[in-house]
C-alpha cells in the first residue's frame, strides 16, 4: 500500500492541551474552510485520514469540499463550494476513499447550497439555499442623500430544500413565507450605505442561516438563523413554525429563550438526551 503526501496544513497540527481523563474517545473530523481538505486526527493530533477536492465532477467544474455529516455506511455528505469557478454550491456524498457517490443539483439559484446539508432517514438530503426578494427600504432607515434614488434593495433570505437522490425537489421552506420582515438588524442594513460601498452591489443578507437539523422523533426541522440570532423549530412536513428561540424582535414572534443571549450562533443539534445544543 502507499500513503498520499499529507497537505502542509495537517502536518503542522499540534496538541496544546491533553487531559486524558476528560477527552472523549474516538477521532475528531475537521475541514479547512476555503481549502477543500477534510481530515481526521486522533487524541495526539496525528492525522489518521484525509480527503481532498481532487474530484471529477459531472460538469467538469472545480469545487472545494466541506464536511457536514457522516452516514451509517461510513461515507459522508457535505457541501461543494464552487464560488472560485463561478459555480453554484451543491450537496454531495463521498466514500472515505475520496470516491464521489452522489452529486446534488448543480444549477441552484444564487450561490447554491451553503453552510449545511443534513441526511434524512429516508435517504433524502436537506440543504440550505438562498432566495432573493426585492424589498422596499424600510421607513425607519435613514439613507445618505447620495443614495436617495434607491427605493428597494434585494434581500437574501434562506430556503430549506429537500432533494431525493434523483435530484428532485420534494419539499421546501422559505423564510420569506414564514418570518415577519419587520424583524431585521437595522445596523447591518444601514452599513450597506457606508462609503465606499457601490450601490449596484447592494443586497441585504437578512437571515444568513448556517445549520439545519431534522429530528425524526418529533418530525421537526431546526434552523439556525445567524443574523437574527434565532433558532426556529419547524413542523415537518406542514412547515408551520412551532417556536422561535433567541433574541427578541419587533414582531414578537420570538417567544422562547429571550434570556439566553443568543448572538450570531453557528449551529443547532439535537443531542441523545433530547436537549438542543
Predicted segments with their positions:
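Histidine-/acidic-rich catalytic cores in large beta-rich domains
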Residues: 1-277
Amino acid at each position: 500500500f502507499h500513503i498520499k503526501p499529507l497537505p502542509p496544513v495537517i502536518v503542522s497540527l499540534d496538541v496544546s492541551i491533553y487531559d486524558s481523563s476528560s477527552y472523549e474517545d474516538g477521532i475528531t473530523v475537521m475541514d479547512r474552510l476555503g481549502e477543500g481538505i477534510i481530515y481526521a486526527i486522533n487524541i495526539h493530533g496525528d492525522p489518521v485520514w484525509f480527503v481532498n477536492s481532487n474530484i471529477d465532477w459531472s460538469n467538469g467544474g472545480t469545487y472545494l469540499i466541506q464536511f457536514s455529516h457522516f452516514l451509517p455506511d461510513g461515507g459522508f455528505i457535505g457541501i461543494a463550494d464552487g464560488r472560485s469557478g463561478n459555480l453554484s454550491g451543491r450537496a454531495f456524498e463521498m466514500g472515505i476513499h475520496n470516491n464521489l457517490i452522489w452529486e446534488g443539483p448543480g444549477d441552484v439559484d444564487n450561490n447554491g447550497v451553503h453552510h449545511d446539508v443534513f441526511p434524512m432517514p429516508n435517504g433524502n438530503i436537506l440543504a440550505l439555499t438562498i432566495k432573493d426578494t426585492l424589498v422596499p427600504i424600510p421607513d425607519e432607515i435613514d439613507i445618505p442623500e447620495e443614495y436617495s434614488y434607491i427605493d428597494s434593495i434585494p434581500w437574501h433570505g434562506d430556503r430549506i430544500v429537500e432533494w431525493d437522490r434523483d435530484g428532485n425537489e420534494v419539499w421546501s421552506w422559505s423564510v420569506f413565507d414564514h418570518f415577519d420582515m419587520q424583524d431585521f438588524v437595522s445596523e447591518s442594513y444601514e452599513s450597506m450605505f457606508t462609503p465606499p460601498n457601490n450601490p449596484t452591489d447592494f443586497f441585504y443578507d437578512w437571515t444568513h442561516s448556517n445549520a439545519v437539523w431534522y429530528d425524526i422523533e418529533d418530525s421537526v426541522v431546526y434552523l439556525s438563523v445567524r443574523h437574527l440570532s434565532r433558532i426556529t423549530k419547524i413542523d415537518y412536513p406542514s412547515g408551520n413554525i412551532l417556536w422561535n428561540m433567541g433574541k427578541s424582535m419587533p414582531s414578537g414572534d420570538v417567544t422562547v429563550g429571550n434570556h439566553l443571549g443568543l448572538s450570531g450562533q453557528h449551529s443547532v443539534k439535537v443531542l441523545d438526551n433530547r436537549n438542543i445544543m
